[in-house]
């Protein structure tokens, strides 16, 4: 069922680029992200003794919770980082990839015309996620803290929720009609099928559970085993083309 796919990954079928900037600093660190909660998360990790790589991974996880209109575990991303110790520049490619069953004409009808919305909404629009693998790779190869320490702030943020802002309302409105088509998604990101009021709290318990699983068992638990099979089954049952070998 589609709700398995959506509620575990919390992959929302819309994407926008973030334009807001939230910065904070103390005498030692400066952090700027697209959301104030993610900025605080980065500072928290640095104050715990983590390095910039740890902070980048934790911020990514936090944005997956508090910025669902632009980030998420079901998507992809990349990181350009600098290691001062040896003056090394590091680029991490965690972009999503197309399922192996993808075809160049899969978004066209028999007459060669584009099928409206097929490449944007629903399981056929979903690439194979790279964010989780990217976070795990950064922490393992460049970080100083453990994965569970990196993900703990995002886990708590998903459990307790974040406050609806005018920005949230504006960006959700762009895809409100699409969200309504998926009951589990609308139950989380809308209130009674309407855009939430400013000050409402968005809680994502299933996302918290997914992050907890990753924190405990690593990224392999996301891409292999029962969880991965659930994702693939859900996508296929709703017309998508994922296979377990894609993950």
Language-model segments: residues:
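Bacterial N-terminal signal peptides that target proteins for export
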Residues: 1-10
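Noncatalytic scaffold domains of N-terminal-nucleophile
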Residues: 24-40, 44, 52-217, 222-224, ...
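N-terminal signal peptide c-region/cleavage motif recognized by signal peptidases
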Residues: 18-20
